[in-house]
Amino acid sequence: MGRRGYYHLFSDGFRTDVLFEDIKAFVAAMNIVALCYLKCQVRILAFVLMDNHVHFILYGTEHECMMFRDKFVHRYGMWFSNAHPVRRCSRLDFDIKLIDNERYLLNSIAYVIRNGIAAGYAYCADDYLWSSGGLYFRLPQRMEALVSSWKTVSDIPSTEYRRMFNTRDRFPSDWRITPEGFIWPGNYVDYRLVESLFKSSNSFTFFMGQLKEREINESLNINDQVSLPDLELREKAVAMSHKLYGVTNLRNLDVRQRIALGKELRREYRSSVKQIARIIHLDPKYLKELL
């Protein structure tokens, strides 16, 4: 069966094009996370979905964590194929790392929760919807007040259920659904375990305040040479594309235009080749030769 432990399951955004390009994709992925939890014998301590990569801190055997990975990749690929019949989903390559000491575990949890902040998407962790960030060390009464008006799974008619969740599998009837339409992570994330690991809100705040991105990225062999967050660089690229070519959808640029745009982004913002390639949808190896 294998020994259970804490694992960091992650994908590298520098190896992946955009995974979740709009709110519908994020909502679908959030519901898939909840479904994978039900299907696998893992405990989810923390997770975040970014537009081009994901992170999960899981407790289970390595085999159970890999099953979780495989189900997530399969389910999201199916959803993407149905939503975009003529396009292929970006390849989602997961790596897995055993977490072998307590301090690294606490740093890793904080790193995952901080991901939205580090990418420039939110001012604090609980502002970033597509994660477990808003669950930890919350006053129970306020948490209950927040979710008490939300629908539960039992409120959803069977005809709407399949359309909403893209599955015949049933979620527990008392699970809450957010106003955005995804299963609330508080239903399945083991945030109480996380609180017991940190022991106090002071300790949690301390670790959240530690800028460990470079240290964690190096331990995961992730390249973090980024001059601007993806969101900001993408906005700059769109504005530059509109100015140069009158085009705001970067996918509509031809190869020559993308190369020229990439050169301008490199000159103006000194971003890495991999980041620019991801933003303008070009093979980084091809772009590197040209830049």
What are the residue ranges of the model-derived segments?
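Short beta-strand->loop micro-motif that forms the acidic, two-metal-ion catalytic signature
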Residues: 52-60
